Amino acid sequence: MKLPEIESFDLSQKRVLVRADLDVDLKENYRLKAILPTINYLIERGANILLLGHKGRPQGKDSLLSLRGVCGELANLLNKNINFIEEFPTMPPEGDLVMLENLRFNPQEESNGQEFAQALANLGEFYVNEDFAVSHRVHASIVGLPKLLPHAAGFRFRQEVENLAKVLTNPRKPVVVIIGGVKEDKITYIASFEKFADKILIGGRLPEFIQNNLNQKEIIATLLPDKEDITIHSIENFEEEIAKAGTIILTGPVGKFEEEGHRMGTKRVFEAIAKNQEAFKVAGGGDTVKAINLLNIAQSFDWISVGGGASLEFLAKGTLPGIEALN
């Protein structure tokens, strides 16, 4: 899948709007680090950068969901000053590195309001999408804005698409998908995954929401009585399938790994993935990444996506609204 590249444009002295992944926990700043190559590239090319992003799901303005703290952390990572703009500007703000306050403080961001998209476009001359994690949303800064300005995908955005696309295009067989976590809506993706997966291993709280096997490809874990982890028998079944896999997609822990007493399932399943050195291994989702880091096995994965829902949506549909907007 070919996306427009920032290297193809002369952006010197241009006002570049960067839709950045700023919805981060400051204790887990790996997602901020992921956008640094794009920002540094634009700085080196002499662009004037206006960073756009969101945090949480505010209902109007909410000081607890301000991006000011994120601005400070990103400034430290870049070792540069970032001018933080609290009120939405009517004119392009001065400075070569600027961040606007949480876009979701304006309800038109999430409703994809044309007026808001135009107001954003008036602040710049070029648009870069460097927020893969929210590109499954039809929001003004994701799909409205690139219709109004010349545009390209950021480096991380392109890497996300390239690596996730490998799973859909001639993957090494067999393909094993592990779905865990607590979000019931993940079940809706199973039918789509059946199109390319050979086995789908279902853990976490999801077995509670499945009445019976939908397909022979699925192995549904049995939960312990407290429902906080999967049984030893289920762990062994998962380990057996993982050992045979040529491609592994991991989305969600299989138990409440944050508590040591409920960590065995996640530990053994994740370590089984790490031990399979022949497979192409992809992981995604906030809790998945936390568990990977806790177990210190990040180096065993070929790709760790910054997208949770966006990764699932891409694997299910092969595209996202944010990708379509760039094309």
Region annotations inferred by a language model:
Residues M1-N327:
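Active-site loop-to-helix "anion-binding N-cap" substructures in soluble metabolic enzymes
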